[in-house]
């Protein structure tokens, strides 16, 4: 009975798929959190978890092995110094995938992938407060525009 392969193809050739996942992994290391499609996030999670497990060894061989995939020296340094120090105590599950609303243009399922132990996540209260402030500014700005249009019409 045919079972199929355990990985998503993402509509790409094997080389393009590997390059995409390596690029997403690099950006995740640099930014600690990225927004992408749900399928790409789940595949990136597989790749980055294996990289962190290798990086926890801290050997030169591990660095060279990871450098085959991530060709950014800054990202390698951050992975070995910051990320491993932060999530090194865990035995796996270094990342989380948070599902978001569908993308407006094509209704693709979107998700955020981020490292678990980083407290840089935006708290809901802070984002809600800033959105209220932005809304107040927009309302004031629109009132000024309405007044200006009314004056010019007279």
Swiss-Prot record:
Signal peptide limits: none
Recorded hits in HAMAP family, A to Z, give: Ribosomal_bL17
Residue ranges, annotated region (Disordered): 125-154
Family that this chain belongs to = Belongs to the bacterial ribosomal protein bL17 family.
The protein's name is: Large ribosomal subunit protein bL17
What's any GO biological process attached to this entry? translation
Q: Which PROSITE patterns match?
A: RIBOSOMAL_L17
Cite the record's note on assembly: Part of the 50S ribosomal subunit. Contacts protein L32.
Keyword terms of this UniProt record? Ribonucleoprotein, Ribosomal protein
What Pfam families does the record point to? Ribosomal_L17
Please provide, alphabetically and separated by semicolons, the GO molecular function terms listed in this UniProt record. Answer: structural constituent of ribosome
Keyword Ribosomal protein set for record: yes
What is the originating organism of this protein? Answer: Chlorobium chlorochromatii (strain CaD3)
* GO cellular component entries: cytosolic large ribosomal subunit
What InterPro entries does the record tag this protein with?
Ribosomal_bL17, Ribosomal_bL17_CS, Ribosomal_bL17_sf
PANTHER family attached here? Answer: LARGE RIBOSOMAL SUBUNIT PROTEIN BL17M, RIBOSOMAL PROTEIN L17
